[in-house]
């Protein structure tokens, strides 16, 4: 993981406020640094300032593979997507929604920009759990 970005989506309950965002980002940076030390990683992921949904999708779709985690119709299982790759792409972006998930309009916008719609199984995962789940799947595929 190289970059962690928060963004505002339609169904997000928490609204980003400039006053508290700096403090939250500093906390996220400390967590990223401690996690990197614990895992003996030389690279500490960058924690960027919050961006709009549109900017987040623009950034995410610059990678070789953009996985848009969506619980709606028309998704492919994550395992199927990863098995279809001969080799794991050099750069992968993972877009995970807030506690309210994504609206259909957001999913359509991401798909139009080239994101691959993926599901994470039958259960709806919490945001924190979903990110760890997807990262673990990517690490498993890349290290086998």
Where are each of the predicted segments found?
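RNA substrate-binding interface of SAM-dependent RNA methyltransferases
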Residues: 1-67
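A generic "binding-loop/recognition-motif" signal
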Residues: 9-10, 74, 98, 131
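Short, charged, surface-exposed secondary-structure boundary motifs
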Residues: 16, 77-79, 127-131
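Short, hinge-like loop/turn segments at secondary-structure boundaries
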Residues: 21-25, 85, 136-137
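Glycine- and other small-residue-rich loops at beta-strand/loop junctions that grip anionic moieties
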Residues: 48, 70, 99, 123, ...
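A short acidic, often aromatic-flanked loop/helix-cap motif at beta-alpha or helix-coil junctions
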Residues: 52-57, 74-76, 125
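Active-site/ligand-binding-proximal alpha/beta "capping" segment
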Residues: 63-101, 105-106, 115-119
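Structured adenosyl-cofactor binding patch, chiefly the S-adenosyl-L-methionine
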Residues: 104-144
């Amino acid at each position: 993981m190289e970059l962690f970005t928060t963004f505002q989506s339609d169904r997000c309950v928490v609204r980003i406020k400039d006053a508290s965002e700096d403090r939250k980002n500093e906390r996220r940076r400390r967590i990223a640094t401690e996690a990197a030390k614990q895992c003996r990683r030389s690279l500490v992921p960058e924690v960027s300032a919050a961006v709009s949904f549109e900017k987040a999708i623009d950034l995410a779709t610059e990678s070789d593979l953009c996985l848009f985690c969506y619980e709606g119709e028309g998704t492919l299982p994550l395992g199927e997507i990863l098995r279809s790759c001969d080799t794991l792409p050099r750069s992968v972006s993972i877009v995970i929604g807030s506690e309210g998930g994504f609206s259909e309009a957001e999913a359509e916008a991401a798909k139009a920009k080239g994101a691959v719609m993926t599901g994470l199984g039958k259960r709806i995962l919490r945001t924190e759990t979903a990110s760890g789940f997807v990262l673990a799947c990517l690490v498993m595929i890349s290290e086998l």
